[in-house]
From Swiss-Prot:
GO cellular component, one term: cytosolic large ribosomal subunit
Keywords: Ribonucleoprotein, Ribosomal protein, RNA-binding, rRNA-binding
Organism: Bradyrhizobium diazoefficiens (strain JCM 10833 / BCRC 13528 / IAM 13628 / NBRC 14792 / USDA 110)
Pfam families the UniProt entry points to: Ribosomal_L2, Ribosomal_L2_C
Coiled coil spans: none
Subunit: Part of the 50S ribosomal subunit. Forms a bridge to the 30S subunit in the 70S ribosome.
InterPro entries: NA-bd_OB-fold, Rib_uL2_dom2, Ribosomal_uL2, Ribosomal_uL2_bac/org-type, Ribosomal_uL2_C, Ribosomal_uL2_CS, Ribosomal_uL2_dom3, Ribosomal_uL2_RNA-bd_dom
Protein family membership: Belongs to the universal ribosomal protein uL2 family.
Protein name: Large ribosomal subunit protein uL2
Function: One of the primary rRNA binding proteins. Required for association of the 30S and 50S subunits to form the 70S ribosome, for tRNA binding and peptide bond formation. It has been suggested to have peptidyltransferase activity; this is somewhat controversial. Makes several contacts with the 16S rRNA in the 70S ribosome.
Disordered: annotated segments: 199-277
SUPFAM superfamilies reported for this sequence: Nucleic acid-binding proteins (SSF50249), Translation proteins SH3-like domain (SSF50104)
Top-rank taxon: Bacteria
């Protein structure tokens, strides 16, 4: 889908660049496939802010998206493509031959009327699901499982994909968008194709109010605060902080590694950080 620009009638319109969503379904989602969504405003169960700069925004309905695709060898027809406010990608409503419906992540080049299927050996075409070990090397994939049967976790955002670049005994090697190469078990499943809405990265918010509609509050810098609020706060006039960048709680930021899941390090063949050096 193409990008839309607008006549510069206001500064916000001048800067605004949106994805053209005119080809998407304009009605309401299937009620049986939705849930109510409570807005947390960045607060946890004790009412304290755990994620800063969140709150407000338009009320959203949660669409239940099928990331597992575990109806094996049951063809489904794409009924329509829909907008989903909870994610950057578009979703597709599919209907199985037994009459059940489901939402799936819409890949690029998936159209209304297309047939998709999940199985051990299926055609290599967008929207089909199969175990990674049965895919040909070089296949572009998304919605990739990391644990067998858990459902897709990798490459689910708009325009993202990974590539299957090799095999190693029971495992396959996939290359992610970040440049990281990692081992995933061959019985884990993935969906063929790249995720829809690749133009999302080229959009421009246009004005501050549009961020508020999305539930994002203004992000204040530490150096503009008082000393009570941030380690970088205070000083006469504008200052540069006077120390290496830290979080509001005094921990180093901007580059300090925070990954602690050492048990899965053995599956990372090429770190995304090594590539950048």
């Amino acid at each position: 889908m193409a990008l839309k620009t607008f006549n510069p009638t206001t500064p916000g319109q001048r800067q605004l660049v949106m994805v053209d969503r005119s080809a998407l379904y304009k009605g309401k989602p299937v009620k049986a496939l939705t849930e109510g969504k409570h807005s947390s405003g960045g607060r946890n169960n004790t009412g304290r802010i755990t994620v800063r700069f969140r709150g407000g925004g338009h009320k959203q309905t949660l669409r239940i998206v099928d990331f597992k695709r575990d109806k094996v060898d049951a063809p489904a027809t794409v009924e329509r493509l829909e907008y989903d406010p909870n994610r950057t990608a578009f979703i597709a409503l599919v209907k199985y031959e037994d009459g059940t419906q489901a939402y799936i992540l819409a890949p690029q080049r998936l159209a209304v009327g297309d047939s998709v299927v999940a199985g051990n050996y299926v055609d290599v075409k967008p929207g089909n699901v199969m175990p990674l070990g049965n895919m040909p090397v070089g296949t572009i994939i998304h919605n990739i499982e990391v644990k067998i049967g858990k459902g897709g976790q990798l490459a689910r955002s708009a325009g993202t994909y990974a590539q299957l670049v090799g095999r190693d005994q029971d495992y396959v090697i996939i290359r992610l968008n970040s440049g990281e190469q990692r081992l995933v078990h061959g019985r884990c499943r993935g969906t063929i194709g790249a995720v829809s809405n690749p133009d999302h990265m080229n959009t421009s918010i246009g004005k501050a109010g549009r961020n508020r509609w999305l539930g994002r509050k203004p992000h204040n810098r530490g150096v503009s605060m008082n000393p009570i609020d941030h380690p970088h706060g205070g000083g006469e006039g504008r200052t540069s902080g006077g120390r290496h960048p830290v979080t509001p709680w005094g921990k180093p930021t901007k580059g300090k590694k925070t990954r602690s899941n050492k048990s899965t390090n053995k599956f990372i063949l090429l770190s995304r950080h090594k590539r950048k050096k």
